[in-house]
């Protein structure tokens, strides 16, 4: 799809990837080059280079619906707006928030050209750095209880462990709610045992990147923060030890005997 000027207002909800600018897609770069406005959370807008003719609209966390409404109104006025998210905009990010605002907003917003531009989400970047821990069935769970109760998070953790999924956790731990990840680790040790491998991948693809693979029995809540992607293997996930560093992977197949 073209992002040329002179076509009226539009919105591109764009994923900036996990951190390395080399992982931003050409489609997202083209949208940013054509944009008149960039809207997003402060650290994500900071990743966009300023230039003449481009207005930057950074905003604080937890104002996603206000941010979405602002972007929609700008586009309704004929502006070319890029709403930026880290990773992929459709994975625990701004695409859903914008469509929530669109659904309840003024009727004229529905005439706006809206496009979602995918990016590399942190889950996939972290998995690639470690090997292939998501090589078989897996699930992604947001551990933040800002938009859902802990009881629902616990239910999903239990069911995922029972089904023997590998599990990828977004937003595992913050300063305001450190107890949630403590409870998560305790529950996983109860359900999966102490030997299950767990990956802590922090600030993946940036200069601050760190990777740690430990057994669940040695995992501590303070190994994670809001910049950390946590991946827990399934019962089939393996570690290949080598001098260049371990490889964490999950085999592609499961026999009928094992599955039964």
How should these model regions be labeled?
Residues 37, 73-77, 103, 128, ...:
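Generic secondary-structure signature for well-ordered alpha-helical cores
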Residues 45-47, 90-92, 123, 205-208, ...:
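Short, active-site-adjacent cap segments at secondary-structure transitions
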Residues 3, 91-163:
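Class I SAM-dependent methyltransferase SAM-binding "motif I" and its flanking Rossmann-like core
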Residues 1-117, 255-260:
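Class I S-adenosyl-L-methionine
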Residues 69-74, 155-158, 218-221:
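Short amphipathic alpha-helix with an adjacent loop that forms part of the alpha/beta core around
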Residues 62-67, 122, 146-148, 205-208:
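A short acidic, often aromatic-flanked loop/helix-cap motif at beta-alpha or helix-coil junctions
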Residues 2-3, 11-13, 80, 162-260:
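A contiguous loop/helix-start segment that scaffolds small-molecule binding in enzyme catalytic cores
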């Amino acid at each position: 799809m073209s992002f040329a000027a002179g076509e009226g207002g539009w919105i591109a909800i764009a994923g900036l990837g996990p951190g390395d600018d080399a992982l931003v897609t050409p489609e997202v770069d083209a949208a940013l080059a054509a944009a008149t406005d960039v809207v997003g959370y402060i650290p994500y807008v900071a990743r966009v280079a300023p230039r003449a003719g481009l207005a930057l609209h950074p905003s604080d966390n937890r104002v996603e619906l206000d941010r979405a409404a602002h972007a929609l109104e700008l586009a309704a006025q004929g502006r070319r707006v890029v709403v930026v998210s880290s990773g992929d905009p459709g994975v625990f990010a701004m695409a859903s928030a914008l469509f929530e605002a669109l659904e309840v907003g003024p009727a004229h917003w529905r005439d706006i050209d809206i496009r979602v531009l995918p990016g590399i989400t942190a889950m996939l970047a972290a998995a690639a750095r470690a090997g292939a821990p998501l090589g078989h069935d897996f699930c992604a769970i947001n551990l933040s209880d800002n938009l859902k109760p802990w009881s629902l998070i616990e239910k999903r953790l239990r069911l995922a462990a029972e089904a023997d999924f590998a599990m990828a956790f977004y937003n595992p731990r913050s300063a305001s709610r450190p107890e949630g990840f403590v409870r998560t680790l305790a529950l996983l040790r109860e359900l999966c045992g102490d030997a299950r491998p767990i990956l802590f991948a922090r600030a993946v693809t940036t200069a601050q990147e760190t990777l740690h693979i430990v057994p669940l029995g040695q995992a501590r809540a303070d190994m994670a923060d809001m910049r950390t992607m946590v991946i827990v293997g399934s019962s089939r996930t393996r570690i290949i030890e080598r001098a260049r560093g371990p490889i964490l992977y999950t085999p592609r197949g499961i026999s009928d005997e094992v599955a039964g």
